[in-house]
Amino acid sequence: MKQDQLLEYLEHFTSVTDGDRLAELIGRFTLGMGYDYYRFALIIPMSMQRPKVVLFNQCPDSWVQAYTANHMLACDPIIQLARKQTLPIYWNRLDERARFLQEGSLDVMGLAAEFGLRNGISFPLHGAAGENGILSFITAERASSDLLLESSPILSWMSNYIFEAAIRIVRVSLREDDPQEALTDRETECLFWASEGKTSGEIACILGITERTVNYHLNQVTRKTGSMNRYQAIAKGVSSGILLPNLEQVVVTNFPKLMQ
């Protein structure tokens, strides 16, 4: 694909605001790169037990139906690996990773091949607010390693823009379906110190407010995040990116080590 075409896709992915339009754009890009299908799973940690999962794909309907009906998401080896690494996953080398997979999970790939999904490359994606994505570009034939290796730099580059577009679209949809109040600065401060294991009394001393006020703010956080208690609110705060590490007092390690 020529450079001007790639830049055009980049602009489209940066500005797209509709899920169906995004699916169409990914499909066109996939074909232009020499692949037959794509499959893109976006996982948003609304809850550890029931995260929000959105699938964009251009795979055969028969495969989508079989995959969904047999609950293959939980045993999909691509999903398993993508949640543990950031490097691309080459389908024709999955056997080398078998020891890291659930027993029998490679059967999913054998079944996929029967439906015409025979080779591909998958990119694990990780967002700033705890989102996970897995974008796969797939061939109907057992493509040579040359195609996978030669196209992977461009696919990896563009995957990040596709990922950001999907997050933007899905997050807007979630806010429209279930609008949530934003946390105030003080609520975020209380949640931050609670995540550090501080009691309400200790947080009160740190922030110079009363313990009763701390409990009020943490109760507000619990309500706004739809949590059962402050511990679940902490988990949601960490997974969603509301809570971020404080970099003001960090100890920095340099490599190579600086001269004394």
UniProtKB/Swiss-Prot annotation:
Q: Which Gene3D superfamilies match?
A: Transcription factor LuxR-like, autoinducer-binding domain, Winged helix-like DNA-binding domain superfamily/Winged helix DNA-binding domain
Annotated region of DNA binding: 200-219
SUPFAM superfamilies named in the record: C-terminal effector domain of the bipartite response regulators, Pheromone-binding domain of LuxR-like quorum-sensing transcription factors
Biological process terms in GO annotation? quorum sensing; regulation of DNA-templated transcription
| Residue ranges of every copy of the HTH luxR-type domain listed in the record | 176-241
Assigned keywords, A-Z: Activator, DNA-binding, Quorum sensing, Transcription, Transcription regulation
Keyword Transcription regulation in the entry? The reply is yes
PROSITE patterns associated with the record: HTH_LUXR_2
Family membership: Belongs to the autoinducer-regulated transcriptional regulatory protein family.
Question: What is the protein name given in its UniProt record?
Answer: Transcriptional activator protein AhyR
Lineage, broadest ranks: Bacteria, Pseudomonadati, Pseudomonadota, Gammaproteobacteria, Aeromonadales
